[in-house]
Amino acid sequence: MKLLILFLAALGAASARIRGHTIKG
């Protein structure tokens, strides 16, 4: 369960980073 939460957190961070990059660029 902990691994799943960690994976989701990493995915959310990556998604936010991509989203910010797209908005900036």
From Swiss-Prot:
Gene Ontology terms for molecular function: hormone activity
Keywords: Behavior, Secreted, Signal
Gene Ontology terms describing biological process: negative regulation of female receptivity, post-mating; sexual reproduction
GO cellular component labels: extracellular region; extracellular space
UniProt signal peptide: 1-16
Record localization: Secreted
Protein task: Responsible for physiological and behavioral changes in mated female flies.
Name recorded for this polypeptide: Accessory gland protein 98AB
Record lineage: Eukaryota, Metazoa, Ecdysozoa, Arthropoda, Hexapoda
